[in-house]
Amino acid sequence: MYLVFGIIFTSVIVTSCSYNTKDFNSVPDFSPVRADLGYAPSRTAQTYPLPPRESNYSLYRASGNSFFRDPRAMQPGDVLTVQISINDRASLNNKSDLKSDSSSKYTIGTGYSFMDRIAGSLEGESSNQSKGDGKIERQENIRLSVAAIVTDVLPNGNLIIRGSQEVRVNHELRILNIAGVVRPRDISGNNMIEYDKIAEARISYGGRGRISEIQQPPYGQQLLNQISPF
């Protein structure tokens, strides 16, 4: 019996450990560069402009177009800057109240009595009451910039971008990932684009390290929360 309790106690202690053994007593490691760019060539044939042709007998050269336009990301491998400025606030308050009462009474009488067993009555009452109250408040404020790489060009000219940024401060690693589809016309003259102009935007901001481990409940507590009926 003591052996069984000892095994259970040891299992709870081991599963309750919330530290990652890989990062134990060490700083979190960075991800390899270009590890999660997810570049996948498009199956649709792509067409790109041909290089300018030399014109030896003209004062105008097509290669001089770059002097009259701002450099912007247009081809796979080009880099652009994404400005992320999120300041959202939402408040939701729901309240419901349900109450129902019912009462019924039945009486049976025949005018005769045989040992006082013919006449009778039946009564019933029921009551039901339900109340619910829910409130959600959310506020997010994120301001940062991240460089993204053009990974593919769609047939209509839109660009698929993906970027990642990792910053390690002491024993905490902050990770920012962004991906989506942008139109070349939305890229500003300084090769920057706002996050709200990115279609299918996927923005992830989190981290791992000592602070993240402390904020998460231990594994044993999470397991008990899943199986506990109370």
Curated annotation (Swiss-Prot):
GO CC terms of this entry: bacterial-type flagellum basal body, distal rod, L ring; cell outer membrane
Keyword Signal: yes
Cellular location(s): Cell outer membrane; Bacterial flagellum basal body
Lipid linkage positions (S-diacylglycerol cysteine): C17
Domain of life: Bacteria
Protein name from the UniProt record: Flagellar L-ring protein
Keyword ATP-binding part of the UniProt annotation: no
Assembly, per entry: The basal body constitutes a major portion of the flagellar organelle and consists of four rings (L,P,S, and M) mounted on a central rod.
Organism of derivation: Bartonella bacilliformis (strain ATCC 35685 / KC583 / Herrer 020/F12,63)
Keyword entries, A-Z: Bacterial flagellum, Cell outer membrane, Lipoprotein, Membrane, Palmitate, Signal
